[in-house]
Amino acid sequence: MKTKICGLKSLREIEIVNKYAPNYVGFVFAGVKRKIDEEVASLLRRELSSEIQAVGVFVNESIERIAKMCEKNTIQLVQLHGDEDRDYINALKLEVGAPIIKAVRAQSVEQILEALTLPCDYFLYDTYSEHSYGGEGKRFDETILTEVYKESSNNEFKKYLQKPYFIAGGLTAQNVRLLDSRLEPYGVDVSSGVESMGQKDEEKVKEFLFAAWRWNEN
């Protein structure tokens, strides 16, 4: 299972992830709390270990801006966390070769089934929030995923269930080890669960990554 630490903002946080080596980090270009600009992202990317891939997180962003950051190699993957639909994703794919992660802020089985046919490379399942596009650190109800993969295994959605997915939403070192063993996520995504006072906490990052790796071994 891959690991992703999202919402990096400083060189100190880059030092932490370089030390413990998650597979991915996320640079957020939307919202307020963890938003950074392209100049900061470029600086952080230069200091990031070449073994770690940078994901740009966008909400209803212009395709031109995303393409420009991909071209500069500031990011290697694109995460769409807004209302981007099939037409948007297809148009983006014409402009960038980077893999695309589509966030699904799911409240129900039906919402996930509706999203499954989108032409992205990965899904990221996050908690629905009425007030923001992020999950705000609230735990994702993974029983929805279990239901999807049980109910859809023998119907027209079966072929889409092979697409890799991340689980996000309120994960911590304490609860990531409790993920349903019937699920087979490609990766887990964490942000607030490894923070103290709004900054990435080295001890929490280490604990989370080790807990995720141990779950992967079970």
From Swiss-Prot:
It catalyses: N-(5-phospho-beta-D-ribosyl)anthranilate = 1-(2-carboxyphenylamino)-1-deoxy-D-ribulose 5-phosphate. Keywords: Amino-acid biosynthesis, Aromatic amino acid biosynthesis, Isomerase, Tryptophan biosynthesis. CDD domains: PRAI. The keyword Isomerase applies. Gene3D superfamilies: Aldolase class I. It holds the Pfam family PRAI. Pathway: Amino-acid biosynthesis; L-tryptophan biosynthesis; L-tryptophan from chorismate: step 3/5. SUPFAM superfamilies: Ribulose-phoshate binding barrel (SSF51366). Belongs to the TrpF family. This is N-(5'-phosphoribosyl)anthranilate isomerase. The gene is trpF.
